[in-house]
Structures are given as structure tokens and as C-alpha cells.
Curated annotation (Swiss-Prot):
Residues 261-295 are annotated as: Disordered. The lineage of its organism: Bacteria, Pseudomonadati, Pseudomonadota, Alphaproteobacteria, Rickettsiales. The gene is rpsB. InterPro entries: Ribosomal_uS2, Ribosomal_uS2_bac/mit/plastid, Ribosomal_uS2_CS, Ribosomal_uS2_flav_dom_sf. Pfam families: Ribosomal_S2. This is Small ribosomal subunit protein uS2.
Length: 295
């Protein structure tokens, strides 16, 4: 049986997941996820981050296991390359530059743009066909292709709406979230102390600005998706030796089943004692180290 990845408080702390924004920038709707404040910066309750991350990872795993498609979204500079790297690693889809309005709700128009991109690709790869164009025309086509690739590279093989949206920075990606809500697409999202968690089905309280934090999230998301892919392939009788090839190409199964939307989590009520003790200990250790440095 595949093992869904999990995370502990120490790993989150090392990645700086506990650092929120300045207290003056907070969103009161995040109050239940905040542990306290230090030096006018909110500290995120990593006990809840651990529990809710594990719930989100299970949602990702189950979606891919059922041949569902996941769309990773983050267009902020520090997340752009990381999102693409890990989405490609697990054979899923991504938007990492500009979210075009209607990417989900006006799919017909987006599909037309993808078709245009594919035609430009074919033309530019056909040396014989290019003989009929001037250098300026070829340059114009190359520029159009590059512009389309920026927005569509990660979804050019996506032929229908995704079954799950994974977002880093809900404020920046509010249009994507609104479109997903309209289409009843469940949402996994990292929610920082200035975020609104209302429309997020699987919130993960955490720092959404740190590169180390973002890389940790994406690594866990990709691993969960890969485990789901492995289970899906086993169920389909696919040779597991060919798994890497399938992962590189992305999911191509036409037998897509939508993940049933799970009950929405507003906060975690049952945090086990071991996790609680670990959180208190790592915070105390951090304080001791800080005091030692300032001595």
C-alpha cells in the first residue's frame, strides 16, 4: 500500500512556516490559526498546520488515486519556478505566471488559445513550411508562441476542469479561487495570517512568502500526488516500471472521477498531545537560541 507523506512540527519550523505577517496586516478570520505574536509578527499555530497539512495531503492523494486532475496555482515570483517544477514532477498541471480571467469559467476561449499555441508549435517546427514565411513573420510567430506559453504551458494538456485546485497565496490568486468556487472545484490552499480562509476547503495555515516554506509545501503535495498515481496505476494493471514515463507526461487517463468534496475544516479541534508538546518545545528552543545569540 502506498504511504501518503506526512510532516512534523520540526520540519515546518525549520522552513519558517510559523512566521506570519505583521500584526497590523492580519485578517481576523485567521484568528483561530494564530498561536500568538512576537516582535509585532503573528506566529502561526503549527499544531494546526501539521494536522491540516495531513488532511490536505490525503485529499491530493485521493484525487489522483481516482484519476482526478490537480491544478497548482501560484503566480508570485518566489513560487513561480517551484510550482512548475513540482507539478511537472508529479504529472499534474499548473499556472505560474498570469492567471487569465476565465481559465476555468470560460474554458472554451482558453481551449482556443491552446489550439492556437499548438498550431504555432507545429508551424515553427516544420522547416519546409517556414520557407513560405519572411524572417519578420517567423519572429512574430515565435513571440506569439512565447507569450502564450507563459500563461498556458502548464495547462496545454488539460482538456477539462480540474478536480482539485492547489493554491499558494489566496490573496494574489483570488480570481482563480472565485472561479473554482463557481464550478464547485475543491480548493487546497496555504493561508497566511493576512489571508481569508472562507472559500478554502482544505486550509493549511502557514507562511506563503518564504521560498523554503513554499518548496516544502510543493514537495509534500507532489509526493502525495505521486503516491495517488501509483495506486491508480496499480488498480489499472499498469506496469509500475513505466511509472516515471507516465509521471513525466502527466495524467492522460480519460476515466476521470471527481473527488467528493469533504467536510470543510474551519479549525482542528483534536490535536494530539505529542504534537502539542513538540510545538511548545520547539518554540522554547527557538527562544533560548535567540536569547543566546543576543547575550
Amino acid at each position: 500500500m502506498s504511504k501518503i507523506p506526512s510532516v512534523n512540527i520540526k520540519a515546518l519550523l525549520d522552513a519558517g512556516v510559523h512566521f506570519g505577517h505583521k500584526t497590523s496586516r492580519w485578517n481576523p478570520k485567521m484568528a483561530s490559526y494564530i498561536y500568538g505574536k512576537r516582535d509585532d509578527v503573528h506566529i502561526i499555530d503549527l499544531r494546526q498546520s501539521v494536522a491540516l497539512m495531513n488532511v490536505a495531503l490525503n485529499a491530493i492523494y485521493e484525487t489522483v488515486k481516482k484519476d482526478g486532475k490537480i491544478l497548482f496555482v501560484s503566480t508570485k515570483i518566489q513560487a513561480s519556478d517551484i510550482i512548475a517544477e513540482y507539478a511537472e514532477k508529479c504529472g499534474q498541471y499548473y499556472v505560474n505566471h498570469r492567471w487569465l480571467g476565465g481559465m476555468l469559467t470560460n474554458w472554451k476561449t482558453i481551449a482556443g488559445s491552446i489550439e492556437k499555441l499548438n498550431k504555432l508549435d507545429k508551424t515553427l517546427e516544420n522547416e519546409e513550411a517556414l520557407m513560405g514565411y519572411t524572417k519578420k513573420e517567423i519572429l512574430d510567430m515565435s513571440r506569439k508562441k512565447d507569450k502564450l506559453l507563459l500563461s498556458l504551458a502548464g495547462i496545454r494538456n488539460l482538456n477539462s476542469k480540474p478536480d482539485l485546485l492547489v493554491v499558494i497565496d489566496t490573496n494574489k490568486e483570488h480570481i482563480a479561487i472565485n472561479e473554482a468556487v463557481k464550478l464547485n472545484v475543491p480548493i487546497v490552499a496555504v493561508v497566511d495570517t493576512n489571508s481569508n480562509p472562507d472559500n478554502v476547503d482544505y486550509p493549511i495555515p502557514g507562511n506563503d512568502d518564504s521560498i523554503r516554506s513554499i518548496r516544502l509545501y510543493c514537495s509534500l503535495f507532489a509526493d502525495a500526488a505521486l503516491q495517488g498515481l501509483e495506486e491508480s496505476m496499480k488498480a489499472s494493471g499498469v506496469d509500475m516500471g513505466a511509472m516515471q514515463e507516465h509521471t513525466d507526461k502527466g495524467l492522460t487517463s480519460k476515466n476521470v472521477s471527481k473527488l467528493k468534496q469533504a467536510k470543510k475544516f474551519s479549525k482542528t479541534k483534536n490535536i494530539d498531545e505529542e504534537t502539542n508538546t513538540e510545538f511548545e518545545q520547539v518554540l522554547n528552543d527557538a527562544d533560548e537560541n535567540k536569547n543566546s545569540d543576543n547575550a
